[in-house]
A protein has these predicted regions:
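Conserved P-loop
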Residues: 1-77, 137-155
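Conserved nucleotide-binding/hydrolysis micro-motifs of P-loop NTPases
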Residues: 3-4, 33-38, 89-91, 106-107, ...
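Conserved catalytic network of the ASCE P-loop NTPase/AAA+ motor domain
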Residues: 20-23, 91-94, 108, 118-127, ...
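Loop/turn-to-beta-strand initiation segments
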Residues: 26-27, 79-82, 96-99, 122-128
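Conserved GTP-binding G-domain of TRAFAC-class P-loop NTPases and closely related GTPase folds
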Residues: 47-65, 83, 166-186
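Conserved catalytic/switch belt of AAA+ P-loop NTPases
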Residues: 59-60, 67, 114-127, 131
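Conserved RecA-like ASCE ATPase "motif II neighborhood" in helicase/translocase motors
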Residues: 78-115
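Conserved coupling/interface region of RecA-like P-loop/ASCE motor cores
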Residues: 149-198
Length: 203
């Protein structure tokens, strides 16, 4: 659900592990789709300039995690403990010695999810954060990609699933009330079959 702190929790745990050297990995890699413009090659500027609008949420999260430290997100990048990469740039690389956070994974089709998984190299761990109820994908075939992907992961001993519920919403009381009300109405019905499939895998 929206507002449960999925990305915040994942970043906190990853940063705590990297900074305190409690894991063998050396850095954090955040991966995110550039949807609705997956192919960002036509945008002006270098990679940093093209992706800046999508890294802004992480700037805010780092400021919350490190109050009083100027530009903590940029500092982490310059210290080489953090990197950001759009899915468009994943093909052909091998990600080693990293904690990989795939954020907003509900906006990835199966091809993108599959590509990311095949990039994971030695001494790396990968985490997927997302909420299929917030997907920006409109093509039903693309929406079903995450179902197929989770069915594959469900059969792997290396993976575990953590599901957040309505009572886990912490962004605001208003949002929590809204989500609970929305889930009772027709607006959630389009996702009912997806919900049942995913929860059957989690159960």
């Amino acid at each position: 659900y929206a507002g449960t702190g999925k990305t915040f929790i994942m970043l906190y745990l990853a940063l705590n592990a990297i900074l305190n050297r409690t894991v063998p990995q050396e850095k954090i890699l955040i991966v995110r789709s550039m949807l609705p413009i997956r192919d960002i090659g036509f945008l002006p500027g270098n990679t940093e300039e093209k992706t800046s609008v999508y890294t802004e949420p992480y700037n805010a999260l780092f400021e919350e995690l490190f109050p009083g430290i100027p530009n903590p997100y940029d500092l982490a990048k310059y210290s080489d403990i953090l990197d950001f990469m759009p899915t468009s740039y994943m093909r052909g690389i091998t990600v080693r010695d990293s904690l990989v956070i795939v954020d907003e994974c509900q906006n990835l089709n199966f091809h993108e999810l599959d590509t990311i998984m095949t990039r994971v190299g030695q001494n790396s761990k990968i985490y997927f954060c997302g909420d299929f109820l917030q997907t920006d994908l409109r093509n039903p075939q693309e929406q079903n990609g995450i179902i197929k992907f989770m069915e594959i992961l469900h059969d792997m001993k290396s993976f575990r699933t953590i599901a957040f519920k309505e009572h886990d919403i912490v962004r605001s009381g208003l949002l929590k009330e809204y989500i609970i009300s929305k889930n009772k109405k027709e607006y959630a019905m389009n996702f009912d079959s997806i919900d049942k499939k995913l929860r059957s895998k989690i159960a």
